Amino acid sequence: KYHLRYFVAFGTLLGTVRHKGFIPWDDDIDVGMPREDYERFLQIAQKECGEEYFLQTVDTDPEYHLYFAKLRMNRTRFVENSLQKSGSITGFYIDIFPYDEISDDEAEMEKQLNRAVRWGMILSIYKVKEPQIGQYGPAKDFVMRSIWHILHGGMHLCGISAGMVWKKCNQAFMKKPEKGSSRITTFAADAKKWIIEKKEIEQLVDVPFENITVKIPCGYDAILT
């Protein structure tokens, strides 16, 4: 309807190519969008969701802390471990990831990746009062949780707003590489692992997925290799 470019990604792409549907260990649907299409989608979806769906972002859900959007089905319940203590809105969902340019230059690329990780962590600390920490042993878990609480409380006491943090995150993730780019990735996931060539999404191919048709990149072989 709106001619937005999208493609299934990650485990959903693998399942589409190999099984024409879900793979047993993947319990969601992952969709990628070039940044310009993603931003248009966020605007359009606000008007199109109606009462059946909810577009979950940092802007629409004060308790949500992830950098990508979720399109949730209202009147359903599905609670992820990462969100169970956040008070965030639940429901069955599709993950929608923005893809941004990443530098062809190795040194600049590493700077982009480090900046994305840093600001993603800052966003999480600001948004999440009770972190999911429990894998390092009682003593270290206690120290890490205490540091998290101090940083979380400190940012709020200093009058830092969610809008300020979100703006800085967006600037970090969307900053254009200075040394040129023929590639894109999503900084909302394992960015280095999911780098793809722009040419791989120049043509999107319609393929069956369960009982619907979805789009995959023409370069899906290279992406999955």
Q: What are the residue ranges of the model-derived segments?
A:
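Conserved catalytic core of two-metal-ion nucleotidyltransferases
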Residues: 1-2, 42-104, 123-223
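Active-site nucleotide-donor binding segment shared across nucleotidyl transfer reactions
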Residues: 2-29, 33-39, 199
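Charge-rich, low-complexity amphipathic helices
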Residues: 20-22, 35, 63, 67, ...
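A short secondary-structure junction signal
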Residues: 106-111
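Short, His- and charge-rich active-site/binding loops that engage polyanionic ligands
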Residues: 113-117
